[in-house]
Curated annotation (Swiss-Prot):
Listed GO MF terms: mRNA binding; structural constituent of ribosome
CDD domains listed in its UniProt record: S1_RPS1_repeat_ec1_hs1, S1_RPS1_repeat_ec2_hs2, S1_RPS1_repeat_ec3, S1_RPS1_repeat_ec4, S1_RPS1_repeat_ec5, S1_RPS1_repeat_ec6
Annotated coiled-coil segments of the chain: none
A GO CC annotation given for this chain: cytosolic small ribosomal subunit
One GO term of the biological process aspect: translation
Note: Present in outer membrane vesicle formulations which are used as vaccines in human.
Key words, A-Z: Repeat, Ribonucleoprotein, Ribosomal protein, RNA-binding
Functional description taken from the UniProt entry: Binds mRNA; thus facilitating recognition of the initiation point. It is needed to translate mRNA with a short Shine-Dalgarno (SD) purine-rich sequence.
Protein name (record): Small ribosomal subunit protein bS1
Residue span(s) of domain S1 motif: 22-88, 106-172, 193-261, 278-348, 365-435, 452-521
Pfam families tied to this protein: S1
Record has Transferase as a keyword: no
Family: Belongs to the bacterial ribosomal protein bS1 family.
Amino acid sequence: MSMENFAQLLEESFTLQEMNPGEVITAEVVAIDQNFVTVNAGLKSESLIDVAEFKNAQGEIEVKVGDFVTVTIESVENGFGETKLSREKAKRAADWIALEEAMENGDILSGIINGKVKGGLTVMISSIRAFLPGSLVDVRPVKDTSHFEGKEIEFKVIKLDKKRNNVVVSRRAVLEATLGEERKALLENLQEGSVIKGIVKNITDYGAFVDLGGIDGLLHITDLAWRRVKHPSEVLEVGQEVEAKVLKFDQEKQRVSLGMKQLGEDPWSGLTRRYPQGTRLFGKVSNLTDYGAFVEIEQGIEGLVHVSEMDWTNKNVHPSKVVQLGDEVEVMILEIDEGRRRISLGMKQCQANPWEEFAANHNKGDKISGAVKSITDFGVFVGLPGGIDGLVHLSDLSWTESGEEAVRKYKKGEEVEAVVLAIDVEKERISLGIKQLEGDPFGNFISVNDKGSLVKGSVKSVDAKGAVIALSDEVEGYLPASEFAADRVEDLTTKLKEGDEVEAVIVTVDRKNRSIKLSVKAKDAKESREALNSVNAAANANAGTTSLGDLLKAKLSGEQE
């Protein structure tokens, strides 16, 4: 080996010793292909770097042949004369230096919001990913940050830890610095009643915050429009420019209340004059609830059709079964309360009242027919014209049977006849009777056999305490054992059996409970009195010729014969 070659090798050896991993050097781009960028850093050999390290966010190669770039040494020449270089690490090193200088000097940097993480957002500042806490996104808390994603926004670096690869930035710091002067000017000129423009920056369930330029104003949901607004997002969207009136301004607390609906005339003014009670008009269903439907009768004016005012007969139906959102319906003004901004509307009032129609076409005592709609513990409902029902109470099913027994004979869907007993249009009630189709056997019987009458019947059933006497096919009387004879009877079964004929006097009539009490003892006493009266009359007629004893014997003998 010549001395010249040895000197060259020695110089290269010294040069390599000075190039350590992690050092940043300059290299020239000498070739670019599909997979690699070839650079010459003045080393023994050229180096290949992955082409991906030279592409921007759009996937475009940022360099061309002849450009000089900074690269970082990852490893020095190995036994094959190769040195591994990295463009990416060099860029990151430069970006870290820029971040450190920006933090030290308080400079403002730009970055792109590229993701959402727990507690905040991630920001790409060149090749460094930083963290933006949710509390530092704005000068006020921001509930929805989705509109920031993908946007380039300015920040300040407030925390830096290169070892842990941790960078924290603040957008709030930038806003507070830049909005200070704007806020001061705005606060000096802001007045209640003035009209101001702003940008919607955040939407919540209860309203929206509007950036007025240095200070935020609250636009409450109730001040968005005169009509009902379910959610502010129906009217507003983030980033939208709006015009509003300053309703209230607290300079000390720097709070501003805004209103959009106040820019227009209150549609409730003079509403009762425009729509007198009983007015019929058409409106559009704007909202449905469990208790009714809201109908917009003009722009910004809604009224409630309560579920009970939707249909004459279907009172428990869900409003969605009757109308749908957007339906045009005819309604009647029932009541307007301008003070409370409430309107009561009715839909059924625009239709014929089936109760009034029934009352106009039927009178008390009329016979009707209909199908059994339902059977309850208190009676039978019968379907009537117009989709309404009439009630046959248990007590009006049968003259002779109890209501509980009589109701078992009826089935749902069965056609029945009944008599109209009463019509109450106001309460929407119609009383019917089935037993009234026939005469009252009990009433007919006691009309000719009242208290004190002598009646005959047969024993239907008997026990120790008394007997049930069939006085006719449909009327019964009760004979207590104590009323069988003047002498005490301990067990009436020793005196009577089923089928025996009995003659007795009616001693009690209970029309309310429809019961008759009988007495054989009273019948015997009555006959004895009549016999005595007859004897006395004969004695008076034959005074002086015949003794009382003879007359009584004669009377008794005649009765026995």
